[in-house]
């Protein structure tokens, strides 16, 4: 079993435990009743539709490929730094075992910043989508590799019903077709292969032509330099998601400024 399969399986176990505390029907009702102007009218999508390249900046304490990234995880301070530096959205890891994430990180960050947040986790059950909205997320991640085409379409419709967005993550040509057929409005190409953790930023360039222009195109992972950003701009991406590069920067504002202005 590769790491992606392990992450998906652990998500199923987490959901089963969460359902013992709050049932699916209860979680649905809470999500439907959750009112927040940052969650209305697909704020995440709107933030990515502005002119030029949008930046999604990630808060994460660790990762399976890099281990512990930030022992002293000042997540609220980091989120504030990102917002002050001009980030358009914030990605918050909530997966607890391999990424050392927490639902509380998302809940507190979403309350603290004025820009939209995405719950970065391994969605394997509709429960997690409703849960994400109650935590303050304006978007969720849907990974084609761990979902059937039927699930993907269903989960996008649930997001639509809640007024939140979905980044549909793809890794290859087959998944690109799956995402387009499911009526995804935001498609992210992960330049990191989650099965073996190899990184190839050319993956975004390779898959770009398969995505219609009316779909928001996001390049994810492996972005380290101004040269990487230039390539991403050249292929016509609408947004880029940057994690480790910013997390390891002593001056996050300076690093984001450097990348944004390249």
Q: PLM features: residue spans?
A:
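Conserved, mostly hydrophobic/aromatic
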Residues: 7, 57, 82, 132, ...
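Glycine-rich phosphate-binding active-site loops on the catalytic face of alpha/beta enzymes
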Residues: 131-150, 188-197, 235-255
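N-terminal active-site wall of soluble small-molecule enzyme domains
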Residues: 59, 66-167, 173-179, 204-207
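An N-cap/entry alpha-helix motif that binds or orients negatively charged groups
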Residues: 2-70
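Active-site beta-loop-alpha junctions enriched in small/polar residues
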Residues: 10, 60-62, 95, 122, ...
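C-terminal helical cap(s) of enzyme catalytic domains, especially alpha/beta-barrels
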Residues: 206-210, 233, 248-262
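Catalytic cores of alpha/beta
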Residues: 124-135, 173-182, 219, 223-242
């Amino acid at each position: 079993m590769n790491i992606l399969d392990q992450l998906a399986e652990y998500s199923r176990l987490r959901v089963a435990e969460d359902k013992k505390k709050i049932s699916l029907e209860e979680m649905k009702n809470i999500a439907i009743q959750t009112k927040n102007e940052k969650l209305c009218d697909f704020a995440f999508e709107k933030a990515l539709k502005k002119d030029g390249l949008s930046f999604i900046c990630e808060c994460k304490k660790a990762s399976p490929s890099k281990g512990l990234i930030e022992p002293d995880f000042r997540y609220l301070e980091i989120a504030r730094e990102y917002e002050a530096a001009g980030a358009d959205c914030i990605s918050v890891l909530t997966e607890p075992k391999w990424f050392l994430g927490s639902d509380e990180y998302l809940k507190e960050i979403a309350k603290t910043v004025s820009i939209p947040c995405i719950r970065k986790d391994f969605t394997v059950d509709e429960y997690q989508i409703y849960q994400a909205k109650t935590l303050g997320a304006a978007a969720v991640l849907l990974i084609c590799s761990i979902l059937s085409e039927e699930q993907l379409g269903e989960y996008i419709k649930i997001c639509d019903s809640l007024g939140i967005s979905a980044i549909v993550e793809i890794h290859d040509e087959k998944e690109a077709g799956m995402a387009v057929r499911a009526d995804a409005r935001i498609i992210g190409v992960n330049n990191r292969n989650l099965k073996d953790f190899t990184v190839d930023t050319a993956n975004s360039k390779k898959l770009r032509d398969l995505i219609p222009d009316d779909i928001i195109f996001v390049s994810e992972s492996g972005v380290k330099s101004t040269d990487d950003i230039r390539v991403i701009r050249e292929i016509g991406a609408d947004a880029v998601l940057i994690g480790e590069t910013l997390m390891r920067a002593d001056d996050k504002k300076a690093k984001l400024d450097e990348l944004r202005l390249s």
